[in-house]
Amino acid sequence: MENRIEMSQLRASKKDSKISYVLLMATKLYLESGQPVGSKLLEETYCSDLSSATIRNYFAQLETNGFLRKNHISGGRIPTDLAFRYYADHNAPFLEQEEILAIQQKLTELPEYSKNIVKDLQKASEVLSDILQLPVCFSSPRFESDSVINIQLVAIDDQRVVFVLSTEFGQVFTDVLWLPEQLPENSLKRIEGFLQNYLRKQPSDSLLSQKEEDLGMVLYNEVVVRYLTRYCHFSEEDLYQTGLSRLLKYETFKDPETLAQGLAFFENRKHMCQLLNTYLHKETPTAFIGRELTDIVGNTDPSCAVITIPYYMDRTPLGAFGVLGPMNLPYQQVFGTLSLFTERLKVILTQSFYKFKLSFRRPCPTDPRCSQRPAELTRSSSIKLLPAKELS
């Protein structure tokens, strides 16, 4: 990639390490202040051994090489995506002790172990988003031997109803179903109660009419078939997102076009799955900054950054978390937070998998198990279609 080549040229050709130091300190100062960096201010803060004139000369060279750009209003310099990449590559993850304690306290909101694995991962993403004050997404495989524990029906209008199906592992499946006719008042609630009793193997309500029971069975079988279709045949990991509105607090995303680019990328399942899977076996955070996202996003210059890190069960990667933000992220703190977060999550997931004997499978566009052993996959979902005689 062109960006990587330019950086390697900087490393290979630098005759004076002070140029590199000026770049790192200018980027650091910009991240701290959010303002263009002038030579005098940099001299007063981090480069007292260099004169303003020398710093300006270094600025000019860095600007020529594409690492800094001049602010036409103040005359100060602003780091480019290449500068942020260089900074991210040359600074180890770092957290103050107070930050570590605060994060550890926040992580106590997560359970020690749980069978409700998907719900817990969703909770973990909420906690991470709250810690970083950034949008978070994560990919997840499909967990085997799941079972439906609740069914809800919500009327949209006279002929359509939303069917909400939730599972023991925390999966939520929704779909829209058409009703053959308008139902009397409270009829939908009675059908919902009948289906919930059926799941729990409890006696049905005597107030339910035969017509309502028959309709409930038809709706149940329809939604189960749709659920099993999605469960058995999936070509991408399940993807979950939270905290998108947190982008609005950053100056970069107050520009509608930049905000639209960032959200469009985060909402694109194909792009996000591709990005999250890129370094699935790398246990440390990976940053994709600015133009490095171009090949995936498809536009000219997404002015944002995505940082990913896989999460593990023992030594096996299950998926990855991704954080979306502006290019001027505090990379050291974000890297440190992600590492601390996934270390804790690894302990929770490992305990949960061994305690409850959980298993999972990954997506495949042409999963041979889906075509050769559909009955086995259907059984592992713990959802069974009603026998035909129960529909009569």
From Swiss-Prot:
SUPFAM superfamilies: GAF domain-like, Winged helix' DNA-binding domain
Alphabetical keyword list: Repressor, Stress response, Transcription, Transcription regulation
One GO MF term: DNA binding
GO BP, one annotated term: negative regulation of DNA-templated transcription
Keyword Transcription: yes
Tagged with keyword Calcium: no
Transmembrane regions listed in the UniProt entry: none
PANTHER family given in the database record: HEAT-INDUCIBLE TRANSCRIPTION REPRESSOR HRCA
Function: Negative regulator of class I heat shock genes (grpE-dnaK-dnaJ and groELS operons). Prevents heat-shock induction of these operons.
Protein family according to the UniProt entry: Belongs to the HrcA family.
Name of the protein in its database record: Heat-inducible transcription repressor HrcA
Gene assigned in the entry: hrcA
